[in-house]
Each structure stands twice: as structure tokens, then as C-alpha cells.
Amino acid sequence: MTARVPDAAGAAPRAVTPGPGHPFIRPYRPSDRDGVIDVCVRTAAGGGDARGVYSDDSLMPEVFALPYVEYAPELAFVVDDGGGRVLGYVIGVADTRAFVEWWKREWTPGFRARHPSPGTPTGRNPAFTEEQLLAAGIDPDRMLIAEVDEYPAHLHIDLLPILQGQGFGRRLIDTLREALAERGVAAVHLGMDAANIDARAFYDRLGFHELRTSRPESPLLGIATR
């Protein structure tokens, strides 16, 4: 699940203070874990709030956020509201193949134990069902897209609505691209919700392009790190 980040093309952050201070980008730290969980859940329904969509609100972050900050915290960056609260983040891995192997060893067993079967239906009927979400949590091979050797890194990015349109989405992506380039990674990819047309417009403005195996119902986009 990726990125629900409509953003102004080329815009620099305006003098807006959604928190107690001026928001700024900084590296992730362990104390940000709960903030990342909160942002993930509140942007996981096609860019909207996914609280109450699944039987357990921890499911989305346990598939699309927490494994990343566990495996590669050095490739996680957050927008701090100026008082320590996380308003958005970008997370990624430099080597998807290595991440998949780590996930099988270190993440799948615990995830399976915590979530052995779907919980009580909520009546929300999301397009990405709870059964699919549980399957994603134990099947990291889903990340091995055909172009993984050309685009070995991948990312997820989410911003709370209060922060969108201020240029932080672009700056987060650029920050991660620079960090990946410094590690010798040439290109990065992402998958996204086809229904999130604002996010797609954002990626197009940044220069992302469709990969060969991209499909209308499940877009795959990539970009060079430099």
C-alpha cells in the first residue's frame, strides 16, 4: 500500500504550523514507532482513515510500515510537527530481495502467531480484504516484481491530510532517493492503489514512470535515484 500524497508540484513548505512548532523532516528514531503506526492507519484507506476497517487496526502497519522500520530504520524519514509528533513518513529498503529473505525469517513467524486467522467482520467490506492482508503478511515473495533487479529498492510514503499540499511529499521522496543513491542503489519502485488518483498525479509530477509489468488495477511505478 503506498502513498496517498497529493502534493503541490515543486512547492516549498509554506509557513504553516499544524503542530506546536514548524514541521521539518528528520531521520526516524525508535520513539516514532507509534506515530508511524498512527499515520499508516489513518491514511490506509485509499488515502483516507482506515481505523475500524479491519478487525485489528494493527494489520495495515504490520504489513506496510513496521517491517520497514525494523529492517532498515536508516532508510526511514519522518515529518516532525516541531514537537515530536509524526505527521508523515517515507520508508524504504535498498535491496528488496534481501528484505524478502529477512521477512521470511524474522517477520512471518511472529505475524502468523499474532494474526492466525481473520477476525470478526467489521461490515466495512474493503476492496483489499482482511484475508488478502493476512496473506500479504506471510508472503513477502509478492514484493519480487519482474523488474526487481532494475529497481531493487522500494518505498512507501504517507502523509496526514493536514500536511498535504505543502511540498513535504516531494521532499521526503527526494530525501530517500538521496539516501539510496549514497548506498549505490540506482532506482526505486513502488506499488499503489489505483483508486488514489491524487497520489498518481503526485508521482507523475515527480517523474515516476510505469514499469513494464504495471497494470491498471495495480500500478507499479519507478524512478532513478539520481
List each language-model region with its residue ranges:
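A short beta-loop-alpha structural element at the N-terminal edge
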Residues: 24-38
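Conserved GNAT-fold acetyl-CoA-binding loop/helix
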Residues: 45-64, 104-112, 116
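Active-site rim helix/loop that mediates acceptor-substrate recognition in acyltransferases
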Residues: 53-76, 81-82
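Conserved beta-strand in the GNAT
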Residues: 78, 85-94
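Conserved acyl-donor/pantetheine-binding loop and adjacent beta-alpha core of acyl/acetyltransferases
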Residues: 96-156
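Conserved catalytic-core motifs of GNAT/GCN5-like acyltransferases
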Residues: 96-97, 189-191, 204-223
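Conserved active-site alpha-helix within GNAT-family acetyltransferase domains
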Residues: 138, 150, 155, 166, ...
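Conserved GNAT acetyl-CoA-binding A-motif
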Residues: 151-153, 180-192
